[in-house]
Amino acid sequence: MIISKDTKDLIFSILTILFVILCLNLIVFFSYNKAVEVNQSIFLMMLLLNLSFIIISLLYLLFLKKLVKFPALLNLFLGILFSFSSLQDLIISLNMFYQILSFSKFIYIFIIFIIIYILFLSFFLTAIKKKLKNKNTYSKPINKTIFIIAALIGIVFSKINFNIPQYYIISFLMYVFSCIFTFGFYHIYIYINSVKNN
């Protein structure tokens, strides 16, 4: 069976995305484990989530020849990977702050973080609505920008010598990544919109 260049590129993209997500999730887990006592419920959630990512990716690759005819499914695939990773990082970040802060301080952090998270989500949904009005759903430039920003944040934080306990930095970085990965909901919105139009 001869595989077209577009299909090969798609396979490479899917495997790359899966590899990046799994690596980030491993970093999140080991950082979480190092900073605070691991919550068994969160450990189980991370385990099931990453197993789900692998299964979904394998199914997509297995039926790729048929699924490639439905580009909307790629948006659903990307949406699931990134939006669930976003929620995972948000939950872990808040859980870490819950363990290291007093309840009153945690409530303030919780409210502020949720408001900022919703603002990020609103930004991506507004961006996709504008793109759909212009009949342009190609999101690669936005995705590239987000990954560049994420990489720069990681580099900056790794080079600065903070006089702050490490677990605060880890908690905040997890929260930053949870906000960045809200663009997963952007892909889900594209999928839902395409299904409605069809």
UniProtKB/Swiss-Prot annotation:
Any GO BP: plasmid maintenance
Taxonomy, superkingdom: Bacteria
Keywords: Cell membrane, Membrane, Plasmid, Plasmid copy control
Subcellular location(s) per record: Cell membrane
GO cellular component: plasma membrane
Job description of the protein: Involved in copy number control of pIP404. This basic and hydrophobic protein may exert its effect from the cytoplasmic membrane.
Protein's name according to its UniProt entry: Copy number protein
Species annotation: Clostridium perfringens
